[in-house]
Swiss-Prot record:
It comes from Methanocaldococcus jannaschii (strain ATCC 43067 / DSM 2661 / JAL-1 / JCM 10045 / NBRC 100440) (Methanococcus jannaschii). The keyword Nucleotide-binding applies. ATP binds at G36, S37, I38, N39, S40, G41, K42, T43. GO terms for molecular function: ATP binding; ATP hydrolysis activity. PANTHER family: AAA+ ATPASE DOMAIN-CONTAINING PROTEIN, YALI0E33429P. This is Uncharacterized ATP-binding protein MJ1301. Belongs to the archaeal ATPase family. Keywords: ATP-binding, Nucleotide-binding.
Length: 400
């Protein structure tokens, strides 16, 4: 069986780029979360900025992609953060040599003996102290450091003398709000993780959100999160469990970057068709949108397959595939728990007529279950639930 590899095409995100570049050009003050549904273009957006929009003479980017890395213990976390080297050069000398050829670094350079000491001591204090010193050296060279962590939720439940995520957020607060030393961007497609950050008393006035979701244009108000976290306090601590939907402090703004709206999706189809030396009728484009909506990766998949397949066959297969996956999912739920199955079906029936609904229309445990299974996506700031894609939505309507 062959594997179709799809490279995300970058298209029409100028408003979001302008927003992020404006943030980068200013003094570091907040932690920024870039989030959205699966395959909405978060990483493509960041890569466009890193590779084509930043001046390498002014900025040094450390990009940590946790997507394909299994992190279960302290040593795994350290290996993600650092890039070991041997020799007498200082970290800043190594960085300057590498950055001439690469737009970003995938680890912070560290001498082998120093790394060995950090492995032995197994404390984040030494890790963060070393990173801070490197970042300060970069600033002394007249450059602005930027830290980007992709799929941050992968360390959400990891413990190192308490929950690592709290240690990390406290450190990021120090880098941004206190020292104004480094810009920090965290990417996540896990809307439950974002909801936990949003609802559980973290990072008051220290964080802002950038929503990579349906591309509807424009800006919307952003809502900060309540009090500063304490290291070692677990998610779900009863002392932290209070609702913060109505915040007293509303500062900053976030950008809607999501799956393309219809107008942008149709333009994207034209763009891809031109690249592939093919033509699409208005009826073709309407049909594609009705099946897959504005999900960039699905539009790319359709256009790519048009080189050797009929459009109706492509779309019918994609819908059948999504429908069968949903049917088998529901079958598994029913066999495991009949009562849960009934509640899940009742919840999904709410999407028979509407693509988006208010989050509290579905009981918390049921919506979290469906979000974890990548059936639904939650925007906790707007309080909106929707299927992960038009394709999933069409499958829901067909099955139920």
């Amino acid at each position: 069986m062959g594997i179709l590899v799809i490279f995300m095409k970058f298209f029409n995100r100028e408003k979001e780029i302008h927003k992020i570049l404006s943030i980068i050009e200013g003094e570091p003050n907040l932690i920024y979360f870039i989030y959205g549904s699966i395959n909405s273009g978060k990483t493509a957006l960041i890569n466009e900025i890193i590779n084509n929009r930043l001046d390498k003479n002014k900025y040094i980017v450390f990009y940590f992609d946790l997507r394909e890395i299994f992190i279960s213990k302290y040593d795994d976390f350290i290996e993600v953060l650092f890039e070991e080297y041997e020799g007498d050069k200082s970290p800043i000398e190594v960085i300057k040599a590498i950055i001439n050829d690469l737009p970003s670094l995938y680890g912070i350079p560290i001498p082998k003996n120093t790394l060995n000491e950090i492995f032995k001591k197994k404390t984040t204090k030494n890790v963060f102290r070393y990173i801070t010193n490197v970042l300060m050296d970069i600033k002394r060279e007249g450059k602005q450091p930027i830290i980007i962590i992709d799929e941050l939720q992968k360390i959400g439940d990891m413990k190192i003398n308490g929950f690592l995520i709290y240690e990390l957020f406290n450190y990021f607060v120090s880098l941004t709000k206190h020292k104004h030393l480094c810009h920090v961007f965290c990417l996540s497609s896990d809307s439950l993780f974002i909801e936990r950050v949003y609802n559980e008393a973290m990072l008051e006035d220290r964080v802002d959100y950038i929503l990579v979701d349906d591309h509807r244009g424009g800006y919307a108000p952003s809502i900060g999160i309540l009090p500063q976290i304490e290291s070692g306090v677990a998610f779900g601590n009863p002392a932290l469990e209070y609702s913060n939907r109505g915040f007293a402090s509303m500062r900053g703004e976030y950008i809607l970057v999501d799956d393309f709206d219809k107008e942008t999706a149709l333009k994207f189809m034209d763009f891809l068709a031109k690249e592939n030396n093919m033509s699409l009728t208005n009826e073709d484009k309407e049909l594609i949108y009705n099946y897959v909506g504005g999900k960039p990766v699905l539009i790319i998949k359709v256009i790519d397959k048009l080189r050797y397949e009929n459009l109706n066959d492509i779309l019918d297969f994609m819908l059948k595939d999504a429908t069968q996956k949903l049917k088998y999912f529901l079958e598994d739920v029913k066999e495991e728990d009949e009562e849960l199955y009934k509640k899940v079906v009742d919840a999904l029936k709410l999407f028979k007529e509407d693509y988006e609904i208010e989050d509290i229309k579905i009981p918390k445990k049921i919506r979290e279950f469906l979000i974890k299974r990548n059936i639904l996506f939650l925007n906790p700031i707007e309080g909106i639930l929707k299927p992960q894609s038009f394709l999933v939505w069409n499958a829901i309507k067909k099955v139920l």
